[in-house]
Amino acid sequence: MEELQGYLEKGESRQQHFLYPLLFQEYIYALAHDYSLNSSIFYEPMEIFGYDNKSSLALVKRLIIRIYQQNSLISSVNDSNQNRLLWHNHFFYSHFYSQMISESFGILVEIPFSLRLVSYFEEIEISKYXNLRSIHSIFPFLEDKLSHLNYVSDILIPHPIHMEILVQILQCWIQDVPFLHFLQFFLREYHNWNSLLITQKKSIYVFSKENKRLFRLLYNSYAFECEFLFXFIRXQSYYLRXISYGTFLERTHFYGKIEHLQIEHFIFIVVCRNYFHRTLWLFKDSFMHYVRYEGKAILASKGTGTPLLMKKWKYLFFHFWQYYFHFWSQPYRIHISPLSKHSFYFLGYLSSLLRNFLAVRNQMLDNSFLTDTIIKKLDTTVPVILLIGSLSKAKFCTVSGHPISKPIWADLPDSDILDQFGRICKNLSHYHSGSSKKRDLYRIKYILRLSCARTLARKHKSTVRTFLRRLGSGLLEEFFTEEEQVLSLIFPKTTPFILHGSHRERIWYLDIIRINDLVNYS
C-alpha cells in the first residue's frame, strides 16, 4: 500500500488519481491473489479444474485485450459439442483471471477511499482509529438511544439492477476516465459470464465461493449515495420551516433526472432542477436515529401517537429508489413496528425493548405515596432458529438441527479439523457475548461438537461414541471458554464464557470489525 500511495502522490493533486496504469503492474495481482487466499472464514481450498492459483501478468493482459475486442468469447459460442467443449475450457480459464482482475479492481478502487480516510484521521489527530471500527460499538449506542424511542423501521436496502448506475456513482470519487471505461467493459463481460451459469451446476459452485470484493465495494458506494441524500433531506427537514429555498446540493445530477416527486400521506415535494418549491418540514423529528450495516438498516423515531412520520419516510425511500436508481422496491423491504411489542433483527441479534414496572415510595414531610416507574432496557438475544439455518446451509447439521459430518474437511489432519471447528466456536462465542441469554448458544455448541466428532469418525472409519470417549466431554470446550487480552478502548476481556453467572453478563468485544459469516444469514 505504501508503494501505491507513493505512486499516487507523484501527481499534482490527490483529486486526480490515475488508476488505469496500475492494472498492468505485477504486484497488484499478487496482492489480489494473497487476499483471495486469506479472506475465507472456512478454509476450503478451491481448485478451478486444473488451473493453479498463480497469477500471470501476461495472461491477464491477454484477457484485458480480449474484453476490448468486438467479437467476445461468449458471442463466438455455437451449439456444436466440440465448440462447446472448447468454450468450457476457455470459459474457466478466463474466469480465473477475470476473478484476479475483479480483486485488483477492488484493491485499486479502495486506494482513493483509504487515502482520504488516512488523511482525515491525520487532520483530527487520531492515531489509534482501528479500535473505532468495531461493529459491536453500535449496540451501546442502541442501548442509549432506542430506550427513548417508540417506533423502528427495519429496512432491507435493495440491490441496484444496472451495474452502470454503480459506475456512475464512482465518477464522483474517481476521475480516471480510462479506468472507469474499462470497469464498464469488465462488468458487462462479467455479467455475461455469470448469466451462462444457469445450466452449469459445477460452475455455480465455483462462483458461489469466490470473493466478491469489488462488488461489495460498489455496493457500499451505492449505500453511501443513499445515505448522503437521506442525511441531506433529514438535515433540511430539521432546520427549515415553511418558506421556499434555493439550491442546497452540489450534486445537481440528482435533481436533473426527475421533474417532481410525489409522496403519499400529505407529502408533496416538487423538485424542479435545483429548487425546492415545497419544504420538508413535515419530516421534522428531533428524535430520529439511523444505523446501517451491510444491506440492512434501522430507522428509529420517537413517533408520538401514530407512526405517520415513519410511513412518510417509508414512501420517500420507495420513490427515491424508483426515480434516482431506476428500480422498483417491494413494500416488504421496510417493516415498521413499535419497539414495545415487536423485536427487530439486526447484526445477528434479535433486539427488543423490555419494560420493567417498578413502584417507588416517595416521602414528602409527613406524607408518603407510591409512584409507578417504567425502566426501559434494550434486550438482545441470539436467534437460535436462524443460526441453525445458517449452520444447515454450511453443512454442519440438517434443517431440523441434527448434527452431520463435514465431508469436505475429512481429508484434513486431525489438528486442522479441530482448529476449523474451534475457530467457528470461538467466533460465535465472542460475537454473541452481548446476548442477555447465552444459554441459547448451548444448542449451537452441541451441534458443532457432534459435527466435529462425526467428521473425525468419518475420517478414521470409526464411531462417534469412540471419539467422544477418547476426547472426553471437553471437546471444543476451550474455544468457548478461552478469552484473549485484546486492545480495547474501554475494557479488556477477562470474563470466561461459562463461569457461574456469566450467562447473564453482557460483553461487547470492541475488536470485532467484521460480522461472522454464520451470523450473516442472508
Curated annotation (Swiss-Prot):
Keyword RNA-binding on entry: yes
GO molecular function: RNA binding
Entry's localization field: Plastid, Chloroplast
GO cellular component, one term: chloroplast
Entry-linked InterPro entries: Domain_X, Maturase_MatK, Maturase_MatK_N
Origin: domain of life: Eukaryota
Any single biological process term in GO: tRNA processing
Record-annotated membrane-spanning stretches: none
Pfam families assigned to the protein according to its UniProt record, in alphabetical order: Intron_maturas2 (PF01348), MatK_N (PF01824)
UniProt keyword annotations, A-Z: Chloroplast, mRNA processing, Plastid, RNA-binding, tRNA processing
PANTHER family: MATURASE K
Function recorded in the entry: Usually encoded in the trnK tRNA gene intron. Probably assists in splicing its own and other chloroplast group II introns.
Family: Belongs to the intron maturase 2 family. MatK subfamily.
Name this protein carries in UniProt: Maturase K
